[in-house]
């Protein structure tokens, strides 16, 4: 298996080979502000399996998450988090093919908009479970 993706303008490309460790839907206010969307769709893969080409810039937020984005088009590509050492957190919107697994966790549901329905109630957390 080899999966790939790119930013909106095509300047940044990524590739990985392993199955995702998890598939997370995050409703925290930081993810909402960073993505401009009510939810961030994220997969976690081992850092040593991540290949990226092209130039990114990064922003570190107070929560200890470093968000990396294309310097040309601004597409969020991936993040790293102090609480998840050794993992790359890829935004699934940049992938050429969406993950074939179901979400494994839906977190920060207390921050989601009221009009957004959670389809996976058995894996939802009002805050971050970690």
Model-flagged regions — what are they?
Residues 1-130:
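A short Gly-Trp-Pro
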């Amino acid at each position: 298996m080899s999966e790939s993706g790119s930013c909106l303008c095509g300047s940044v490309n990524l590739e990985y080979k392993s199955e995702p460790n998890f598939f997370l839907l995050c409703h925290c206010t930081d993810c909402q502000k960073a993505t401009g969307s009510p939810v961030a769709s994220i997969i976690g893969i081992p850092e040593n399996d991540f290949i990226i080409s092209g130039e990114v810039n990064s922003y570190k937020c107070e929560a200890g998450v470093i968000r990396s984005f294309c310097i040309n088009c601004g597409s969020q590509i991936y993040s790293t988090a102090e609480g998840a050492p050794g993992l790359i957190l890829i935004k699934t919107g940049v992938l050429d093919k969406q993950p074939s697994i179901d979400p494994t966790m839906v977190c920060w549901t207390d921050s989601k908009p009221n009009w957004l329905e959670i389809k996976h109630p058995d894996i939802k957390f009002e805050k971050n479970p970690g």
